[in-house]
Design a protein with these regions (language model features):
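Compositional signal for N-terminal targeting/processing segments
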Residues: 1-221
Length: 221
């Protein structure tokens, strides 16, 4: 898997007949912007750099057939209007619109029930560290309640749920037709098994690390 910060022109002949997949690891920057005081200019720079890289690959290998998006139900018919929430002048929106206008189909990779359950598990795990939650549980269940065991159980269920989501997503990705290209927008760190024989390019421009550091610094205060 190639990780692209700077673009170095690959030998097109070595990739010509394979399926090509451009993976964009991201975080919900737009949603986190207010909470973590993320400058919108940094978000725009991130998506602008992504647009440049995708544009390069399109010019080298041809148009993209599918744009796979995390957070959209697999059976849902999603259009460009889904991305209007980011603003029509945003690089995020312009990236998707350019791909869609060139014939790419926007496709979800998740099941709603899996997304909801995964979110519930993560929230429950995070809350288990709050003293107020521990006290509330002890008031009802007694002082002997074992929060470490509870967290171990939650971690186990989180892993099981992620494994199920991984298999489901990998199955959808594997349906990408031969000799075609796809884009995947997915949360950084989410596991995905890519099919053998597929050329996978990880697009992670410098702006990503800058924003991620911004978030970590604020969380560590």
């Amino acid at each position: 898997m190639a990780e692209l910060g700077k673009i170095e022109k690959p030998e097109a002949s070595s990739f010509k007949s394979k399926r090509k997949f451009y993976v964009i690891p991201t975080l919900p920057f737009e949603e986190l912007a207010l909470e973590f005081h993320i400058d919108n200019a940094k978000i725009e720079r991130f998506w602008g750099e992504v647009r440049e890289k995708i544009s390069y690959f399109v010019s080298t290998y041809g148009n993209t057939s599918f744009v796979y998006v995390e957070g959209i139900e697999e059976s849902e018919k999603a259009g460009i209007e889904y991305f209007e929430k980011f603003g029509k002048d945003s690089n995020h929106y312009k990236l998707i619109k350019t791909l869609a206008d060139s014939g790419a189909t926007i496709k979800g990779i998740d099941k709603n029930e899996s997304l909801k359950f995964s979110k519930l598990l993560f929230e429950e795990y995070s809350k288990s560290f709050l003293p107020e939650i521990k006290e509330l549980h002890q008031d009802f269940f007694g002082k002997d309640i074992d929060f470490d065991k509870w967290r171990e159980y939650l971690v186990k269920r989180i892993q099981e749920t992620q494994d199920e989501m991984n298999k489901y997503t990998s199955k959808i990705i594997n349906e990408l037709p031969d000799n075609s290209n796809g884009v995947l927008i997915i949360t950084e760190g989410r596991p995905v098994d890519y099919p053998q024989g597929m050329d996978v390019f990880m697009i992670r421009p410098p702006a990503f690390d800058e924003i991620a550091k911004n978030i970590r610094d604020i969380q560590g205060r």
